[in-house]
Amino acid sequence: MSVLGRIHSFESCGTVDGPGIRFILFMQGCLMRCKYCHNRDTWDLEGGKEISVEDLMKEVVTYRHFMNATGGGVTASGGEAVLQAEFVRDWFRACKEEGINTCLDTNGFVRHYDHIIDELLDVTDLVLLDLKELNDQVHQNLIGVPNKRTLEFAKYLQKRNQHTWIRYVVVPGYTDSDHDVHLLGQFIEGMTNIEKVELLPYHRLGVHKWKTLGLDYELENVLPPTKESLEHIKTILEGYGHTVKF
């Protein structure tokens, strides 16, 4: 009997979570507590709804033409997809049987390395790894947990030579200092499996979800970064030998 997945929702024609037009599956449950999270309602491990790989694939294949025509595919996001690694592995296997490209969007908070993680990565064409912050003190303040597990996962991907894009959320006053950006550059320097770095400007599009849940949004007064700030960060990271986009 196939493993059931607990999902929050899906987006049929996503264009920002991997190449081309993609079917984005938002898995339910996350162990990080990002203060800027725009999917606050995905944290609860018991929330969402259950679905089988078979039923999910019935939905996915209806969009195959759009995905194939644009070099797209499917992306497992969240929440945190790796918390349900067995289900995502089975889903990606089904996608590969249909010739559909697979992408794993993850924060890298992997607690146990076992055959399921390896089997998931074996059927993953691209990993989008969210490196939130290299300064661990800032990371714990902003994200709620240490960054050790994510950094370990980044090194694991390097060891596997796994195709990877790094994603870095630029939050003014938190992740945009020259010192912290240099820490990121130094960490990923020489990681030849990294194809590019994506700078994701902080935004406030998810604030209403916090308020709907009756929760305080601590970054209420933080404004998005300026283009000049993003260009400056881009220049620093390019100095470490990587392609950088925003």
Swiss-Prot record:
Compartment(s): Cytoplasm
Gene Ontology terms for molecular function: 4 iron, 4 sulfur cluster binding; [formate-C-acetyltransferase]-activating enzyme activity; metal ion binding
Residue sites binding S-adenosyl-L-methionine per the record: Y36, C37, H38, G79, D130, L131, K132, H203
Catalyzed reactions per annotation: glycyl-[formate C-acetyltransferase] + reduced [flavodoxin] + S-adenosyl-L-methionine = glycin-2-yl radical-[formate C-acetyltransferase] + semiquinone [flavodoxin] + 5'-deoxyadenosine + L-methionine + H(+)
Matches recorded under InterPro entries: Aldolase_TIM (IPR013785), BssD/PflA/YjjW (IPR040074), Organic_radical-activating (IPR034457), Organic_radical_activase (IPR012839), PFL1_activating (IPR012838), Pyruvate_for-lyase_activase (IPR034465), Radical_activat_CS (IPR001989), rSAM (IPR007197)
GO cellular component, one term: cytoplasm
Record domain Radical SAM core: where: 16-241
Cofactors, names only: [4Fe-4S] cluster
E.C. number(s) listed in UniProt: 1.97.1.4
Cofactor note text: Binds 1 [4Fe-4S] cluster. The cluster is coordinated with 3 cysteines and an exchangeable S-adenosyl-L-methionine.
rRNA-binding keyword on record: no
Pfam families: Fer4_12 (PF13353), Radical_SAM (PF04055)
Matches recorded under Gene3D superfamilies: Aldolase class I (3.20.20.70)
Cited PROSITE patterns: RADICAL_ACTIVATING, RADICAL_SAM
Binding residues for [4Fe-4S] cluster: C30, C34, C37
Keyword Nucleus attributed: no
Similarity section: Belongs to the organic radical-activating enzymes family.
Name used for this protein in its record: Pyruvate formate-lyase 1-activating enzyme
Organism, as annotated: Haemophilus influenzae (strain ATCC 51907 / DSM 11121 / KW20 / Rd)
Gene designation: pflA
